[in-house]
């Protein structure tokens, strides 16, 4: 490429790319564009005129002596009429611009451009010594994308016509778009300053607080200089931190909010991941975010959810958002689709239950004031929606920053040019209000918002997913235990009891923490927070359960100590259908009342015991007679142990329990049969290992061609039985994956409809993917899985390009095939990445990316799942309920020693089993009014839920605990004798797929319960 003569600028711009110099490998100074590395390794970038250097945090130093071209100096005579800016754009982890040895600007991967104003001495003829110091990203090669000088007029009149080239380009853009070359009536920009701020990503959380402080202070300062500027920011968690730790800045911010210049655009507590969290967590994100926003900014209407950067959105999100008062949903992320552009920019997003959000696909976040870029996006918006005014969001993002003075000056300059579409600064709420009249004519989207990218997020960093599900379970259980404790406390309750704090969990669900796509420091610092939150929630749960089980908070004995007989409680905190689980307990003889329970010595210590039947939320008392490691002999006057329900049998390489059976062999689990004897597998279960490299977004993305790059997985011999008995048959299989040791444990229990599999692995690989493939004996027509906010169903064979792009999706707790005569379900302790076809189900277990966390996934990992035959389909098999039972096993609580004499302890019952398809999202205290029960109907049928005689049903509520309809008792459905329930029975009615909330209280005396959260 021939270098441009710096004395001959092309119009009002001067390209500097050919003028930079750097040292070659021999230490000689050469033109930067001629450096041999770029031509060899990145010819595509070289062809675009980029200055390139290698990845891995390597430094590149560029130098340039910049003299003012004589033609430009003449423009300043007899008086200054123009100014010049140094416009740079880079792709570098760190950038510093030095002029005459003095640092004048810095940037990074997020602040990727500048328009530095050249000083007066340059116009007077003194050359400037420019130096650029750039450090390449760790994951990608570095580049100086463009560098040029740009002239600007000092007045909007532009007497020298220095803006004429851009004016002509604006006219050409419109001409190619088929519209008038001049701005049409109604065309324009609604300008709103913004700063996307990730709570953690390539920096720890502590940096985020500092970035937020800088960003908000900068925005408030710019408001004093630019009278039109409006600024908006999301995330209630940030505002809560600011109020507590920076009161002076918070006071300034509140004043700007009152003046209408600073706009909180909240929604959930943080900009959370919206496909990896359960419906209960998604609901809490919106509940806490909305409660906090209404309390902190009471003068504003908080009916919008700002989620520009989350990696896709489950189909149930509109129902959750609508239940908490949200009407508008705003995102930008679907512009990142790698295969199929999303078809709408403005639409109605409808959940299965009929709840809707008005949805806006915004222009890019982190934009600037370039008029050509702005007009290009505006024309695209106009073509997609028929509307002329585009929301424009200038501001440095990701690591905060917001709009800069340079951006605002450029915007102001072009707002005074008749060739550019006019701008008006204003709030997001005002812009959305202008779109409201078009709502009835908008297209309707009845599906998830699947991001055709970042498909590895459900699999990366399984430790974060494990922390998330365990803490969420403890928080729900702690709230429910508080309600149970209030059932027995009544008037004896002394003041408000502690309630679990959801905020640590919700914070860690941020869309770069839970997916595992941050630097290692983020996860190292999160670890003690996970542990502390679990301890606190467990303590509150246990206190509540003790109060419920003993009738007081003492949790004490039932009588004089008798060391030979101990009371234990088997506690079920999910309203599941009747079942008779088998669990491992401490060694001894176990009884229900005076009757021995079926038992079997456990190989790893303790005793397998089949408990009495459980149904609903309840606690069943069982008694332990200590007798060493094995159950003692039966006394002559003691009844023999009852026979196990669905006892396990083992015959050679086969085993079963009446609900399913399996066969082991050289291939591992070679066959599985349902209770009718129908085979489920077309071939043995396949544990697969693949190369997984080459994606730019390493931790985010699975290589699309991973199936074509298999790697060996070696097993040692055949699986071997380790336990054989009427309650448990267990096997063990060892192997290796490269340098990683693998152990597979399988277990079939009496009374269990599933085969449990636990894969333990010392994972040492890099850039590999570990998967389980389940070959189906019966071809599937469709498949289903649960997702955040509901469930999804898909054809087994994709029919459209959009369906083909969904080759990996996130499932929370189960997936199932649907064939002509049944299917097979995989229960997950997820979330997990899953896939399906007509002949297989697949689960992604582990990955090994190296950026941004070099050791992601490495170390000891334990993956737990189960196989469940569905003879008559997944609904008839109760797969959602079985997944709950699999993920949330019974709690065993030690009570005390028995009183000599007959046993009088009875079971505790709180809630009956819910109808098939209805799940409990939460049961939590609501001050002294009672409790709030949250239910979701995941079926296509209307449901009527009977809470039993122990509960009085008050009014129906919305998701923010506000009454719907009229007052207490009027929202209960009292069915006539001809209806599904007996006369006078109070039922909760749910429409298909509906989310519902009710105020309930214990029947009888007024209920005193823990105080609601502040």
Model-derived regions: residue spans:
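Extended carbohydrate-recognition surfaces in non-catalytic/accessory domains of CAZymes
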Residues: 1-72, 273, 684-719
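C-terminal (or distal) subdomains of carbohydrate-active enzymes
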Residues: 317-322, 336, 345-346, 361, ...
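Catalytic alpha-helical scaffold of carbohydrate-active enzymes acting on polysaccharides/glycoconjugates
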Residues: 178-191, 211-226, 241-303, 312-323, ...
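Catalytic grooves of carbohydrate-active enzymes
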Residues: 196-202, 207, 356-559, 821-893
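Aromatic-lined ligand-binding clefts that engage carbohydrates, nucleic acids, or primary amines
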Residues: 73-101, 569-575, 583-584
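Histidine-centered catalytic/metal-binding microenvironments
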Residues: 1-28, 32, 145-190, 199-200, ...
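Alpha-helical scaffold elements lining the catalytic groove of polysaccharide deacetylases
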Residues: 274-295, 362-382, 729
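Beta-strand-rich ligand-recognition modules
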Residues: 95-146
């Amino acid at each position: 490429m021939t270098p441009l003569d710096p004395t001959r600028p092309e119009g009002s711009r001067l390209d500097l790319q050919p003028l930079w110099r750097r040292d070659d490998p021999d230490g000689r100074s050469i033109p930067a564009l001629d450096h041999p590395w770029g031509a060899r390794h990145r010819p595509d970038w070289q062809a675009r005129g980029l200055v390139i250097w290698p990845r891995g945090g390597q430094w590149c130093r560029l130098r340039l002596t910049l003299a003012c071209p004589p033609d430009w100096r003449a423009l300043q005579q007899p008086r200054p009429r123009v100014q010049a800016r140094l416009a740079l754009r880079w792709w570098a982890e760190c950038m510093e611009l030095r002029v005459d040895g003095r640092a004048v600007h810095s940037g990074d991967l997020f602040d990727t451009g500048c328009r530095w104003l050249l000083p007066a001495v340059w116009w007077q003829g003194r050359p400037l010594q420019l130096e650029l110091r750039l450090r390449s990203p760790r994951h990608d090669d570095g580049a100086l994308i463009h560098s040029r000088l740009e002239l600007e007029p000092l007045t909007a009149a532009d007497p020298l016509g220095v803006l004429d080239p851009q004016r002509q380009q604006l006219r050409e853009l419109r001409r190619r778009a088929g519209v008038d070359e001049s701005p049409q009536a109604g065309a324009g920009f609604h300008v709103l300053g913004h700063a996307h701020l990730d709570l953690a990503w390539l920096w720890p959380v502590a940096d985020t607080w500092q970035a937020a402080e800088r960003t908000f202070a900068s925005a408030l300062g710019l408001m004093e200089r630019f009278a039109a500027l409006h600024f908006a920011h999301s995330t209630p968690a940030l505002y809560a931190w600011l109020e507590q730790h920076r009161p002076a800045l918070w006071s300034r911010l509140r004043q700007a909010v009152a003046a209408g210049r600073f706009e909180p655009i909240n929604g959930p507590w943080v900009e959370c991941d919206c496909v990896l969290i359960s419906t209960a967590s998604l609901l809490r994100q919106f509940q806490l975010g909305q409660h906090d926003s209404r309390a902190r900014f009471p003068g504003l209407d908080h009916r919008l959810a700002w989620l520009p950067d989350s990696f896709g959105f489950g189909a149930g999100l509109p129902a959750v958002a609508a239940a908490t008062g949200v009407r508008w949903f705003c995102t930008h992320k679907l512009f990142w689709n790698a295969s199929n552009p999303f078809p709408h920019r403005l639409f109605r997003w409808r959940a299965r239950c009929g709840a809707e959000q008005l949805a806006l696909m915004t222009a890019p976040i982190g934009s600037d004031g370039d008029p050509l870029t702005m007009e290009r996006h505006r024309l695209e918006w106009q073509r997609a929606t028929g509307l002329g005014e585009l929301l424009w969001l200038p501001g440095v993002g990701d690591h905060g920053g917001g709009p800069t003075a340079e951006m605002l000056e450029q915007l102001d300059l072009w707002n005074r040019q008749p060739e550019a579409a006019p701008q008006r600064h204003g709030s997001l709420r005002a812009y959305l209000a202008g779109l409201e009249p078009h709502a009835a004519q908008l297209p309707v989207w009845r599906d998830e918002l699947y991001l055709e990218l970042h498909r590895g997020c459900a699999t990366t960093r399984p430790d974060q997913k494990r922390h998330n599900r365990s803490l969420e379970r403890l928080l729900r259980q702690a709230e429910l235990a508080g309600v149970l404790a209030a059932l027995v406390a009544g008037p004896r309750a002394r003041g408000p009891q502690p309630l679990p704090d959801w905020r640590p969990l919700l914070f860690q669900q941020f869309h770069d923490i839970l997916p595992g796509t941050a630097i290692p420091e983020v996860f190292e610092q999160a670890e003690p927070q996970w542990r502390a939150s679990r301890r606190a929630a467990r303590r509150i749960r246990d206190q509540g359960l003790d109060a419920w089980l003993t009738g007081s908070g003492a949790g004490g004995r039932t009588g004089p100590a008798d060391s030979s007989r101990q009371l234990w409680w088997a506690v079920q905190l999910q309203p599941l259908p009747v079942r008779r689980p088998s669990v491992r307990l401490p060694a001894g003889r176990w009884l229900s009342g005076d009757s021995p329970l079926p038992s079997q010595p456990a190989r790893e210590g303790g005793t397998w015991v089949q408990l009495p039947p459980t149904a609903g939320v309840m606690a069943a008392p069982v008694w332990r007679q200590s007798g060493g490691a094995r159950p003692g002999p039966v006394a002559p006057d003691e009844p023999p142990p009852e026979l196990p329900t669905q006892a396990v049998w083992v015959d050679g390489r086969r085993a079963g329990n009446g609900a399913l059976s399996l066969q082991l062999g050289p291939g591992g689990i070679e066959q599985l049969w349902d209770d009718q004897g129908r085979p489920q597998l077309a071939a043995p279960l396949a544990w697969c290992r693949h190369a997984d490299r080459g994606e730019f977004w390493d931790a985010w993305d699975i290589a699309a061609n991973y199936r074509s790059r298999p790697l060996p997985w070696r097993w040692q011999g055949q699986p071997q039985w380790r336990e054989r008995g009427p309650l448990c048959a267990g096997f063990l299989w060892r192997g290796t994956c490269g340098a990683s040791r693998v152990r597979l444990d399988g277990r079939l229990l009496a009374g269990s409809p599933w085969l449990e599999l636990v894969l333990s692995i010392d994972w040492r690989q890099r850039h590999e993917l570990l998967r389980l493939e389940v070959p189906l004996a019966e071809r599937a027509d469709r498949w289903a899985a649960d997702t955040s906010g509901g469930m999804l169903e898909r054809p087994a064979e994709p029919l459209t390009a959009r369906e083909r792009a969904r080759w990996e999706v996130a499932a929370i707790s189960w997936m199932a095939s649907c064939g002509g005569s049944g299917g097979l379900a995989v229960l997950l302790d997820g979330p997990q990445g899953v896939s399906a076809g007509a002949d297989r189900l697949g689960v992604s277990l582990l990955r090994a990316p190296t950026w941004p966390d070099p050791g992601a996934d490495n170390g000891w990992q334990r993956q737990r799942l189960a196989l469940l035959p569905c003879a008559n389909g997944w609904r008839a098999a109760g797969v959602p309920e079985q997944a709950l039972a699999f993920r949330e096993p019974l709690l065993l609580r030690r009570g005390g020693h028995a009183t000599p004499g007959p046993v009088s302890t009875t079971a505790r019952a709180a809630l009956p089993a819910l109808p098939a398809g209805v799940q409990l999202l939460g049961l939590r205290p609501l001050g002294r009014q009672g409790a709030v029960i949250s239910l979701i109907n995941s079926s296509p049928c209307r449901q009527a839920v009977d809470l039993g005689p122990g509960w009085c049903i008050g009014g129906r509520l919305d998701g923010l605990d506000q009454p719907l309809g009229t007052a207490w008792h009027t929202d209960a459905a009292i069915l006539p004798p001809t209806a599904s329930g007996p006369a006078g029975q109070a039922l909760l009615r749910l429409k298909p797929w509906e989310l519902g909330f009710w105020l309930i209280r214990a029947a009888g005396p007024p209920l005193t319960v823990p105080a609601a959260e502040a």
